[in-house]
Every structure is written in C-alpha cells, then in structure tokens.
Amino acid sequence: MIYSYTAKKRIRKSFGKLGDVLPIPNLIELQVLSYNKFLGKNSKGVIDFSNSGLDEVFKSVFPIYDYANNCKLEYTGFKLGREEYTEEECRITGKSYSVPLKVDLKLSINIDSKSSGQLEIFENKEVFLGDMPIMTKFGTFIINGTERVVVSQLHRSPGVFFDHDRGKTHSSGKLLFSARVIPYRGSWLDFEFDQKDIVFARIDRRRKIASTIILRALGYDTKQILDLFYENNTVTIEKGNFFINQKLDDLKGSIAAFDIKHKSKVIVPKGKRITIRHIESAKTSKMKSFQIPNEFLWGKRICNDVIDQSTGEVILSCNQQITQELVETILESNLKKFEILHTNELDRGPFICNTLDVDPTTDQETALIEIYRMMRPGEPPTKDAASQLFMNLFQSSDRYDLSAVGRMKFNTRVGRTETEGEGTLANEDIIEVLKTLINIRNGFDTVDDIDHLGNRRVKCVGEMVENVFRIGLVRVEKAVKERMSTMELAEKLQPKDIVNSKPITATLKEFFGTSQLSQFMDQNNPLAEITHKRRISSLGPGGLSRERAGFEVRDVHPTHYGRICPIETPEG
C-alpha cells in the first residue's frame, strides 16, 4: 500500500507485548486488481490497453460486416480519456465517477463489387462509446453520487462434473449417475442414466434423447460407436463347439459358470471365482482360447455384420443380441468365426448397446433432425437448418466457450495431461465425458463433490463488467449491421454515423445501478466497509436464487476452512 508523506511521518505507538511480525496486507487488492486488469492497467500502474479485458471484448465482436459483405467495420484500438469531475465533486453534485471511452474504428466500403472491385477506405476515426465508470483507490464506484461496491460472485467453475441423485429419483434407491458439461457461455450438455441403465442426453435441460443420437450427429455409425466403448472377442466354431479367444484377465473377479479347460487340464473349476492364481496358471499353460457352452453366448452382442457369401444375406447384424434360436442358426450355417463384444454384469455393462436399442435414428441426417426437433419443437426441420443448429451448439466459437479455466478443469477431469486447448467441444471431448461416466457406473471412478471449493470459482468485478459490456456491444453490432445494409454506399459514410453508443451506456448503467451484486456500500465503520468489499455471494445473475438454494449450498464445507469465513458463508 502506498502511504502519503504525512502518513509516513506519523508516529505509530504500539502498546502490545509482541512486535508486528507481518505487515498488514492490502485487504481490498482483489477488487482493485480485477478492475485494473479489465481496463488494462497492470499491478505497477502501467497502462497497456492491448492486453486488457476490454480489448478482448472488442476483438471478439469486431470486425463487423454488412449482409452483402460490401462494408467492413474494423477495430484498431481504444483509449480512455480523463475524468471530468473528481471523486469529491461527484459525491457532492450527484454525478457518476467515470471516464470517456473512445474507440478507433476503420470503415472499408467496396464501392463497385462487379467490375473493378475498388475499395474506398476511410481513415481511422475515433468514436465515442459512452462513459466507463472507474474505481476509486478504495475499491468502490461512485454512481449518481452514491458509493457502491460490486460484490464478487461464487459460482460453479466451467468444466465437466459427475454426480449421482443419491438414490432419490427411483423408489428402489438405485444410484443414477449423470455428467454435466458447463461452459463459460453456451449450452449445457448433460448425460444421465435412467433406472434401466440406458444413457440419455439433454441439451439445455430440455427433453431427454438417447445419448447415441449425439454421437450419430457427430458422424459415427453403429459399428464405430461400439468400437469406441467396447473390446471385441473372436468366437471360432469347430465341430459344433464354440471356442473364445478371451484373456482370463478380462474375467478376473467373476465366478466361472463352467469348467475353463486348456486341452484336458482344468484351469478354473466351475463355481470358483477367477483369481490372479488362475490367470498365472493360464499364462504358463499358454492358453490362447477355451471352449464355452452355448449358454455363455446368450445375451452377448454381435460386433459387426456377418454376411453369407453364397446368398449375400445378413446372418448376424451389428449390435444384435444373441438368443438361443440365433445360436442354433449360427451352428446350422457354414460360419467359421464371428466377433462378439466383451460385456459382463460385473464391470463391463452393456449400457451403450442398450441405448442403441432405443435409439430411433439410423444415420447422421436423422440424428441431426431429431436434435433439431428437440431444440425447436413445432418448426419443420430441414437438413441444412438442423446441421447449422448442431454446429452452433458446441462447435461455434461465437456461441460456445469453455474458457481457459473450463478447458483446464475439463482436461484434468477426463485424465488428459495437457491443460490447454480449444474453447469449443470437439468430438473426442464428448466421447471422453461418456467414457468417464460409464467408468463411474462400472465402479472404476468416483463422482465429484459439487460444494468443494475446487469445483467453484470467484467471479470478480472486472469479469462481471466485461460480460455486461459484451452484451451491450453485441446489441451495437446488430444495430450497425442494420444501418450498414440500409445506408446508401455512395454517401460519405463515417464510422460515427453508424455506431450508436446508447446500448452500451444503458447496459452499464443497468448493471451498476440495479444489479443484485452492485450494492450500496456499508459505511457504518471502516471494518464493515472492508468486509463488504471482500464479501462473496452465491446469488446474482448466473448464480442461485434464495428460493432454490438447498441445505447443501448453505452448509460449511471442509474446504472453507481457512479460506471463507464460516459466519459470512454465502448467504448463511
């Protein structure tokens, strides 16, 4: 903290028995640093606009094109002017303590696109975009003459979270597991089990659809989907008997329903649990495959289509369940071998196979149309509209962003080593989430604790104002597009003619004046002031509401210890 000359000279007496060990930290640093980062000031007070939150917002919206691509409005930089009134004058006269925000814009107009393609460029013009409230050195804002504090918000960190319903959904008390991908901005994607062990998906908490519809929409067919989640075993047929080339490692922990033999030596007797000793014995005997009774195949799934070479008809189809009749059909045909999926009731549940059974779609196009119907009920679906909608949901950087924190959390949770990546969801990301969810259901992984502070993050002033500013700027973008399309191109257009700053000013005014998190400062005493600035709230836009917050949220979690005051826990 910087002390004035008189404060340095002031004699401070201490009547304590022990001397000070540590200097008092700057207790309101969190607020000041956050807002300075948004405006482009670093910790040393050096101003660098090109590395600020404001600059990022401008770059995410600009350049703006008109509908015919004849006009282009580019952003080249911004600067903040000097404040018109001092803090004291603002308090007395009831003004807001702010500085003018000026943006450098370059307008390019393509006059004659047909023949010469001639470009006419207006030089960079400075456009006034309204007043930007600035923070006093005490971490407060002066809005209409009153001091206000923007309280930091504690919300769920972007990333992927795995949870279960604690047995409340179904009367049997069965745990139904679910996964939720939460982006920084964009649509939420949920995967969940129902009581029949079928995996469903939801987008933005709408009605549920089979999770394989999402995989089909990404371009996978039935065979590829099964290959992603299951291993295959080859079954050979010799003299009317079935032999399987399965490693005993895969069956470890299960009880042998029949004698597992190699040549004539019994490796695992019937009714015994398969242990490491049996696995070692099989390895020393160099057992590659063993005979299985016909009943062992009942309920198993076929891995890929098997076609009769002579007639060309499909004997076995992909994901078909083997029944007693099908075993007899296989023995009657001239099949030498076929492949089955490795599933069991212990740790390799056939959840994706069951989901494919209830999936009404067969290819990518029908899957996209099914998703379109779920998102836009009542509208007639077309192939292009459905494809565009799905692309915009998770793979468009304009509509979807995990953020750097979200990507790091996501990668760590699904077991990747790299912590950086795209802000959008790739095919592999969605598959990794499903695989992790199935691993949790199979007992190889555990669910997350939602109230753990590691799964939450603090949104400070700078970030909140940045989001509000982005909303205002997107409204400006729409107005600019309309204006560009209706104006005559021959007119001498200037950037200031087509940019209207009112939407930005209005959103900022609304946030600082009426937002739940922008509060009138508690000025009863200096301590009340400091605790108000350091307070953390779970309420506010994008957070909880008082009515919906349950007991778990209000509880003191072990991770609060030494981090958050238990008396002022988020809204008690």
Kindly label every feature range from the protein language model.
Residues 1-533, 570:
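N-terminal non-catalytic structural scaffold regions of very large proteins
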